[in-house]
Amino acid sequence: MYKYFAVFILTLKEYFSYRLNFLIWRLRVFIGFLVPFFLWLTVTKQVKNFAGYDEKAIISYFFFSHFLSYFILGTRTVDIASQIQSGEILNLLLKPISFFRYHFFRDLADKILNLFLSFFEIFLFFEIFSIPFPSTNFQFLPLFFLFLILGLFLNFYLNLLISFWGFWSTEIWAPRFIFFILISILSGSFFPLDVLPKELFSLILFTPFPYLFFLPVKMISSPETLINKINLNSIFFMGSFWLIIFFFLSCFFWQKGLKNFSFWGR
Amino acid sequence: MFKKIKRNLKILLLLTYNSLKITSQSRQGMIFFTLGKILRFLLLFGIIFLVFSKTKIIAGWSLKQVIILYLTFNFIDTFSQVLYREVYRFRPLVVSGNLDLILVKPYHPFLRLLLGGVDLFDLLLLLPYLFLLLLFIFQENVSFFSFLLYLVLVVNGLIIATAFHIGVLGFGLLTTEIDNVIMIYRDLLNLGRFPIEIYQQVISLIFTFIIPIGVMITFPVKALFGFLSFKNIVFSFFISFFLLWLSVKLWQIGLKRYQSAGG
Amino acid sequence: MIVVKNLIKIYKIYQKTGRLITDIFFRKYEEVLALDKVSFEIGKNELVAFIGPNGAGKTTTLKILSGILFPTAGYVSVLGFFPFEKKEAFLKQISFIMGQRNQLIPDLTAMDTFLLNKEIYEIDDYQFKKNLQKLTAIFSAEKIIHQPVKMLSLGERMKMEFIAALLHQPRIVFLDEPTIGLDIFSQEAIREFIKDYQKEFKATIILTSHYLEDVKRLAKRLIIINKGKILYDGSLTAILQRFSQIKYVSLILEKKVKQEALFKIGKPIVYQLPKVIFQVEKKELPRIVAYINNKIPYLDLVIEDEKIEEVIKSLFKNQR
């Protein structure tokens, strides 16, 4: 197990050598955050109750959304596809280390580092613009952690799956691009999913999207408005269902990919 | 004089033709990317409708006005991306040293470095955007003069975009960090998808007068509906030509300080 | 054609301290003197080779002469132009070929790049056809000009680079390490090509290389440069006359000779009977040859020059 801890530390070290790049990356993430935040702030300032959200609730939602965004959605598994293409992946496969676990710990280091920074950023931002800090309902914290773990693993396996496209095609950016667009709109990072009309929202709950990001963030920011509208058991069941699907699909395509791929290039 | 223009045009056409040949080699990618862009366009469009189904006005802007703003943004963003695609490939040219072989050719390097990668396929996407934009504009009661002013200011916005891309090239001669610079520009530009008024005072001021996103996108639409002050119109032209001049200066300085790769 | 007087080029290399704020706002830089008051003149139809170790300043010189780099100080005139200004009339008359760098578009065929260059250099149809034919004939490369460049081998690609660069019949050709990384056969082909090209088109060719083979085969004039200073500017044969103090005397002995007799010549560097080789100073040669003729019974006596490589190496060593 120690070797995975080493992976963790190594990933952190990598970040420190690419400091400038990393900080510019955080700047970009923050700029991206400004659009939905201000849009919805302006909307709720004007309309006191927008689909169940008032100013306070929207501030709370986006506070936690920015804080958790990279932690849940961020990943380094994007590198995998190009590593397959270049043959670099062989280096990892020939070592006595589990591929899945290696990338999981790499991601973990990545996520924790970004978590600290995003908290720092959002804290500073709220201070400077004198926006009141939101609070959270501790009663729902266990639910939050449940959906957080579900979301983390769901994202992990889904991202792996997309990276495995590299086994069959040289154009690895294409599916990731589409996936990225779908996620940025439908995950809940641009708008809280439950502002959608009731029918649409119920439909979306059958897709994997809400479980990727929206549900954990909702549970920590303003769970009260959601709890009465949905059946907790059924959404938890749905989320787990998708997790199992992605888990088996990624294992399956991993095995298939290894067999079929001829590791051309270097 | 005309001979020169004709020759430059011929070179440009050849470069564009070559660029088309290269992109058609990766058909799969082309389809996916186009699909992705259309998807994003539609989804964000949907959000606008979603917001306005529950409220009539946002920060002084009506639904139709916000739509026209969004479509204007799309047009300017897509158009400059189509034209200046080659700028995104500048860094590998500098790092590999192949840039030198371009600088030694007897034609203006901008023909190749700025305009040499025109994406004809993406250009096709521009047509439906343009069509939608004009459709929505003509549904409103806009005077001919306002529409003219709008067009001029859109072109002005494109000049700012051009200045920016030239600036990136100049920067690229001095440092290898330009990938980040381009990406920050795209992120900042994205702030212009919605009216600049939704941002709180300080930020809104910054993005109008210092990093002129507001000038590029919000101003033309404001002019269309007669909300743009004369002062701001003058400022718009001033800033675009200033930035253009600045960017060309940056390129020239970059050339003098250029140290080339390897040896 | 080319006049360079007291050319100075200083590079500013930024030092990364590892501390973030320092690296962005208070960058420290080190100044490297790449060219230190370099002067020379090159006329029409010359083939000049610049040699020197890595970092000597060869490529820097070429890049300044072609207008890519801005000189820090000094006078540079090529074909009457100041190269950095990159005037079209100037650029149309020169060409730059760098080994390991490409002007060919990798995803398309070489012919596609040729056609682009035809427009850029404003070559008329007849001239284009004629030059293309001549150049491809020298390389016997008629078939490969229509293949995607990324599919070609390194040697084939280099040949295509040459054709692309010479279609417009430049008056001055700059070649920066043109044979680097190529196999022996490709190197040979490129060397033959350069020789033939100069004969046919009467261009001025300036070549930099690490390979002495390139220099020996092609250049009549040699400029040796190290640490930004010109150490030698003259013909290849004259360099031995000027700098070499050493001759090698090889003996094949007829019969066994007493060691003391042999050692009177000096300490041999090769002592594998019947072969003995001595390293002697030039000025001692007459005395030693006379001695050998009188006292040593030999089957064969050969006197050889020091290898040019050795001469040049010692030139660099002495500079320190």
Which role fits each region the language model picked out?
Chain C
Residues 248-315, 320:
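Short, charged/small-residue-rich alpha-helical element at the C-terminal edge
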Residues 20-23, 115, 119, 126-144:
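Conserved ABC ATPase "signature" region
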Residues 191-279:
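ABC transporter nucleotide-binding domain
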Residues 74-85, 89-91:
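Conserved ABC transporter NBD signature motif
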Residues 173-177:
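Catalytic Walker B motif of ABC-type/P-loop ATPase nucleotide-binding domains
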Residues 107, 148-155:
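Conserved ABC ATPase signature
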